Amino acid sequence: MSKANAKYSFVDLFAGIGGFHAALAATGGVCEYAVEIDREAAAVYERNWNKPALGDITDDANDEGVTLRGYDGPIDVLTGGFPCQPFSKSGAQHGMAETRGTLFWNIARIIEEREPTVLILENVRNLVGPRHRHEWLTIIETLRFFGYEVSGAPAIFSPHLLPAWMGGTPQVRERVFITATLVPERMRDERIPRTETGEIDAEAIGPKPVATMNDRFPIKKGGTELFHPGDRKSGWNLLTSGIIREGDPEPSNVDLRLTETETLWIDAWDDLESTIRRATGRPLEGFPYWADSWTDFRELSRLVVIRGFQAPEREVVGDRKRYVARTDMPEGFVPASVTRPAIDETLPAWKQSHLRRNYDFFERHFAEVVAWAYRWGVYTDLFPASRRKLEWQAQDAPRLWDTVMHFRPSGIRAKRPTYLPALVAITQTSIVGPLERRLSPRETARLQGLPEWFDFGEQRAAATYKQMGNGVNVGVVRHILREHVRRDRALLKLTPAGQRIINAVLADEPDATVGALGAAE
C-alpha cells in the first residue's frame, strides 16, 4: 500500500463473519475489537481474521461503562450492521420497540464515550420507511448530539450498481448506510444544525448522502461510457460474471440439485410458457399466473372435483428419476367453451386486477391450459398451492429453464439471469435454471464480495447461507467508505486520526481488492 503503508484502527460491531472487516482491511484498517453474539458466525470470523469476536455487546457497552475487552486506544472508524430483523421485509415488522432494536443504544454508548472519528452504520431499506420515521430521526439526532456531521438523508446503495472493476456483484441488495464524521468541538456550533430554539435539528439534511441508487459509474476504469446493470450487452450476466465458475469443487455439506417435485414444477410451468409462446408468438406477460383462479371457471372446477387430473408418471432420466408429462388425455376432456365468473368487487383493487388478467388469460387459452394441467397433474397433491402460481418477470427469456428462479410463498418467481435479488437469511436460495441447481455457499460468498480464500470450515451449509443473507457486501462497504472520506476530506484533514484515514482509504484505486490480503494480519 502506498503512503507509507498507512493504517487506521477500527472496531467491528455486530461483526457477523466479517464483511466490514474484509472491506476495511483492504484499505489499511486494523481491527482492534470485534463482537458477534452468534456462535457460528463468530467462529468463522475468528477463523478468517485471527480475531476473537464471540461476545455480547451489552456486556462491553452499557450503563456501567465501555470496556471493549480491554482495548482503550483510539477508534478511527466504527462499523456496525446493527440487527436488521425488526426492520426487514424478510420478516415481521415490529420496529425498534423490540428488545434487540434497542441495541443501537449500546452503539451510542461507545460513540459517546470513545468518540470514533468516522462512523459507518448499516441497516435494511425499511429503516427509512414511513413506519420507522421516528427511529430514523432519533438516530440522526443522537449522532448530531454527540458532535457528528451526518446527512439527514440516507445513503441507499446496492452492489449491482457497481461495475465489477469497482467491486460490484450481480445482486440487488438495497441497504441504508449512515456515515458520519466527528466535528472538532470548536466547529460544532457552525457544523451541527439546530432549530431556532437551539435544539438539535434532526430533520435538516446537512451534507448530501455519500451514495444513491441513481449513481452510475464507468463500465471500464478510466472510461466514459456508463455502466447500466440491466443493459443486455454491457450489464450484468450472472453466468459470465465470475460468480459461477467451472471446476468449482462440489460442496460436501449440501446437495445443490433440485428434487423430483421441484423439477416437476419447473418442467410444468416451462411447458405452459412454451405452449403459449407457440400459440401467440409472444412470451408470457409480466403478471402473476394463478392456476387456482382458473378453477373459478365452473367447467374446470367440475374436472377438479371429479378428480379428472392424475399425477404424471416417473421415468429414469440420466442418473435420476423425473416426472414426465402424461399423453393419455381422454377425448373430449377439454370443454368446448367456458363461462367467465364474476369478480367480487369487495376484494382489494390489486387482487381484482390480478383476477381480471388471469380470467382474460384463461378465456383466451382455456384449451391449451386444461390440456397442460392434465399433462402435468397440476391439480393434484404434487402441486401445493404456492407452486400453482408463477410470477413471470423474465421478459423475453426463451424458457423458464433459462431464468433464475425462487420458490416463494407467493409462487415461483422467474427473472432473467442478469442480477439476483438480495440474499436473505431464510430458505429462498436462488435456482440457476441453465444449471438446474441452486447457488452454492461459495457462490453466495462471491456475491457478497468475499475473497476466494475465505474459509467457512466444516459448518452446516444452512449456517453459511444464513450468514451470507445477514452480511454486508464487501465492495459496497469499500465504496461507501471511500465516498465518505472523499466527501468529508476537508473535515478529516483537521485531525491526526482523520489524516490517517485519508492516507489509507484514498491511497489506492477501488480495484485494489481484499483478495490480495492473507487471512492473517
Curated annotation (Swiss-Prot):
UniProt xrefs under CDD domains: Cyt_C5_DNA_methylase
InterPro entries recorded: C5-MTase, C5_DNA_meth_AS, C5_MeTfrase, SAM-dependent_MTases_sf
SAM-dependent MTase C5-type domain boundaries: 8-491
UniProt-listed Enzyme Commission number(s): 2.1.1.37
Active-site residues, Swiss-Prot/TrEMBL: 84
Annotated PROSITE patterns: C5_MTASE_1 (PS00094), SAM_MT_C5 (PS51679)
SUPFAM superfamilies reported in the protein's UniProt record: S-adenosyl-L-methionine-dependent methyltransferases
Molecular-function annotations in GO: DNA (cytosine-5-)-methyltransferase activity; DNA binding
UniProtKB keywords: DNA-binding, Methyltransferase, Restriction system, S-adenosyl-L-methionine, Transferase
Catalytic reaction list: a 2'-deoxycytidine in DNA + S-adenosyl-L-methionine = a 5-methyl-2'-deoxycytidine in DNA + S-adenosyl-L-homocysteine + H(+)
Domain of life, source organism: Bacteria
Single Gene Ontology BP annotation: methylation
Keyword set includes Methyltransferase: yes
Keyword RNA-binding: no
Gene3D superfamilies in the cross-refs: DNA Methylase, subunit A, domain 2 (3.90.120.10), Vaccinia Virus protein VP39 (3.40.50.150)
Entry note about domains: Replacement of residues 191-272 by a single Ser residue still protects DNA against digestion by AluI.
Family, as annotated: Belongs to the class I-like SAM-binding methyltransferase superfamily. C5-methyltransferase family.
Designated name of the protein: Type II methyltransferase M.AluI
